[in-house]
Every structure is written in C-alpha cells, then in structure tokens.
A protein has these predicted regions:
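An anion-engaging/catalytic patch
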Residues: 1-152
Length: 152
C-alpha cells in the first residue's frame, strides 16, 4: 500500500491511498459522519443491505477474476432477513473480495475502492457524497499531491 493521504469532506478527515492505479477511501472515516463512536455498526448496516451486496458483487465480478460467485449468491439470498449480519471481514474472507480491505491496529479500518466508497457515501448522505466526489476530483486534478491536512 502506498502512503496514506487525507482529504477533508464536510469537516471530516477521510484517509485516501492509492494502490497501483486504484484509489481506496476509508469507510471508517466516512462512517464518522453518521456516528463517530460506532463506525463498525454503520458499515455493517450498509453491507447487509441488498443494494450494497449487489453493487459490491457486480464490482467484484467485473474487476476480480478470483471472486467467489457462489458465496456472493448466498449472501445475496440472505439479504433482507432481519437476522442477516455481514461484516467487511466476512465478505472479504468468504468471497475473496478485493474492493474492500479491512486492516486492524493503528492506522487500520475498513477501506474501499473509490467506486464502492462513493456508493457507501450515497447511503451515508447525498450531500456527503457530493462533497466527497468534488474533493476527490480536486486530488486527481492536482496530480494526487496533498499535504498531511488534505490541502493542495
């Protein structure tokens, strides 16, 4: 993984890093927009929705030749059930996903490819997604050069 950079969105610091040619954004940082103390619950609640599972599954099918489609179908069938729970770790382990990355420890958290992160941002708040997209475009226009506080 490349060195982390930060962008600021609606007064919140969002960690961004580039892995080869792909950008990954911190879902953990984004979830703080909804609930600063329980980010893991925010991410799990989003991941258990049928639309999130379908979007992540489609992304993986298009981008990941090692994606386990049978496991994905099982999750998709379970979605909507009140007792269904899906964590990022479970999704990654069972489906061999590459679009979501979960790291523990200091500087850890849940990261997602920008395509998936923007989908999560829509679920958080359309306004939040708008500002996230604007700031992400500024990063690319500036050649990805940010200071530690997220400014050009």
């Amino acid at each position: 993984m490349a060195k982390n950079k930060n962008i600021e969105v609606s007064g919140r610091k969002i960690t961004l890093y580039s892995n080869k040619s792909d950008d990954y954004l911190s879902l953990t940082d984004m979830a703080r927009y909804r609930d600063a103390d329980r980010t893991n619950y925010i991410i799990q609640n989003w991941m258990r929705t049928r639309s999130a599972i379908e979007f992540c599954g489609l992304w993986e099918q298009l981008k990941n030749p090692d994606f386990k489609r049978i496991e994905f179908d099982a999750f998709k069938n379970e979605s909507g059930s009140n007792s269904f729970v899906l964590t990022p770790q479970k999704w990654i382990e069972k489906t061999n996903a590459i679009g979501i990355i979960s790291k523990s420890g200091r500087y850890g958290g849940t990261f997602a490819h920008r395509d998936i992160a923007f989908e999560f941002a829509t679920w958080i708040s359309p306004e939040f997604k708008f500002y996230l997209r604007e700031n992400n475009q500024l990063v690319h226009q500036a050649g990805g050069q940010l200071t530690a506080d997220g400014n050009k």
